[in-house]
Amino acid sequence: MASDCSPTGCSSESSARASDCALASTCSVETTCLPSACATSSCQTPSFPSGARLPTGCLPPACFAGSCNIPCVVGNCAWCEDGVFNSNEKETMQFLNDRLASYLEKVRGLEELNAELECRIREQCEEDVPLVCPDYQCYFDTIEDLQQKILCTKAENCRLAVQLDNCKLAADDFRSKYESELSLRQLVETDISGLRGILGELTVCRSDLEAHVESLKDDLLCLKKSHEEEVNVLRGQLGDRLSVELDTAPTTDLNRVLDEMRCQYETVLANNRRDVEEWFAAQTEELNQQQLSSAEQLQGCQTEILELKRTANTLEIELQAQQSLTESLECTVAETEAQYSSELAQIQCLIDNVENQLAEIRCDLERQNQEYRVLLDTKARLECEINTYQGLLDSEDSRLPCNPCSATSMSNDTCEPCSAYVICTVENSCP
């Protein structure tokens, strides 16, 4: 499409078409202030064939990233005729300059803030001493030793409990034996007391018999004396007056008979005495032997009972000592557990503090990353605006040496850079 760039060639029809195109192609740019979102433009760029020249009255508007609802109309024939910017281009340049200055100030402030934050982080990292976990291996070894001692003490307590049970059973057996022996002793003592009663009765009987024998001896002596007296009296009365010889049986000798009776009684008495003494001696010997054996058994039982009592006392003392040792070990274990629990709580508090610091550092890093992304987006928008600004400056530099469209020098080649700039501006501004 060829267009006439002369002043007289710009007819009212082309002016109306240019104004309508400018109004129809007014660029409304919407920017979203998101960190990762790039500025989007609602500018609809008309498509033109490559190498085609646009009419001067209907140039597409230049869309600038970051400008909100700012009409940027580029392509009025006034700049070709007058060689200066119109009011819209001046306002756009002023707006871009203000935006560039504000962005530069923001970038400078953010760089200073970033440097300050880096210095603070570096100082904080230098000040923070790395947390070194203390070595608790010695405490763990002590705990293991105490646990081994507790296990050994428990085993020893079990062994002592078994021995104590065995001693109790043995003591019960000896107690039953002692009771049986005591009952036997009581029976033997009862028999001895009965035999002693019989012995007393026999002694009384013996004394009675001895008294009876003595009385019989006295009677015999009295009889002998009375017989001798009677014989003497008779012999004295008879004298020598009468001598009578009788052929009769010989008279018995009373003395001899009495002697024989005395001998028989004495023999029987001696035999009875000997038998009684032998029986008494045998019974006494047997009772003495039983008493000695019972005394020996009783002494042995008493000795065993004393030994068992001594052993039971010793075991009870050892049990009390082991119980006290176990209680002390349990107290020590409880104190150790409490101490380790407090230390673990302190360590957990330190870990929580470090985790909170790490979380704060992560939040700071995330915030800085977000700010960095925002800065990158801002930088991209600034670069886009700078490119647009540079394009406008280049276009201004390219337009300044050109004369307004004269009737003699205006041709198709003269407007070629303008149309190329407009196409380049549209391609760079509205991708």
Curated annotation (Swiss-Prot):
Highest taxon in the source lineage: Eukaryota
Region (Linker 1): 125-135
Single Gene Ontology MF annotation: structural molecule activity
UniProt KW keywords: Coiled coil, Intermediate filament, Keratin
Ranges for region Coil 2: 253-396
Segments for region (Tail): 397-431
IF rod domain sequence ranges: 89-400
GO biological process: epithelial cell differentiation; intermediate filament organization
Stretches for region Head: 1-89
Region (Coil 1B): 136-236
Site for Stutter, residues: 338
Gene Ontology terms: cellular component: cytoskeleton; intermediate filament
A Pfam family assignment: Filament
Linker 12, as annotated region: 237-252
Coiled coil is among the record's keywords: yes
Further comment: There are two types of cytoskeletal and microfibrillar keratin, I (acidic) and II (neutral to basic) (40-55 and 56-70 kDa, respectively).
Subunit details: Heterotetramer of two type I and two type II keratins.
Its job: May play a role in late hair differentiation.
Family: Belongs to the intermediate filament family.
The name this protein goes by in its record: Keratin, type I cytoskeletal 40
Species per Swiss-Prot/TrEMBL record: Bos taurus (Bovine)
